[in-house]
Amino acid sequence: GHHDIAYGLSLGGKILSRILERNEIVIKHSILDAAPLLPLPRWLVTPLKYYQCANVWTCYHWTGFWRWVFHSHYFDVILDECKKAYPFGGSKAVLDGYTSVYTTKLESISGSDIHYWYGTKEAFVARPQVSHLTSLHPETKVEVFKGMNHGQLLIDKPEEVAQRIMRMQYE
């Protein structure tokens, strides 16, 4: 298959990186937004995967709470997806998924135009990812967003993300 543009934030970026690693689909422009590309220290894997599982569980069971906390269409979409997906895999699927995310290392990557985005507030985590990615693909274009934290650009400025993606399409 062939795609013009693919964007993945965090876990979505990890999934996109795995697609690029396998080189099964040609993607003209790829954006990895704060994607975890390196394994975490072993001691951190279990607490983080249970933390993420709790997040997904609360998205499924306490949807109204999250809609109240985050007044954003983006969160409505995420919450709706959790409501659809969680009943089919439950906690085990979430735990298995995050175990894979947190323990695998990107070994290779293919693509003609790869971008890595992250915010300055997550730089301590993102810099090693960028270093690893640029060692595999030196032409990677890295963009750092001042004052932004993990996922904040998409949540707070979805129109800016859309505009950047549209510009890429016509480059």
What is the role of each PLM region?
Residues Y118-M148:
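Conserved loop-alpha-helix segment in the C-terminal half of the alpha/beta-hydrolase fold
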Residues T58-S108:
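Conserved alpha/beta-hydrolase catalytic His-Asp/Glu region
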Residues E21-W57:
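Flexible "cap/lid" loop of the alpha/beta hydrolase fold
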Residues G1-D4:
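Conserved acidic catalytic loop of the alpha/beta-hydrolase fold
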Residues S110, Y116-Y118:
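Short beta-strand/loop motif that positions the catalytic acidic residue
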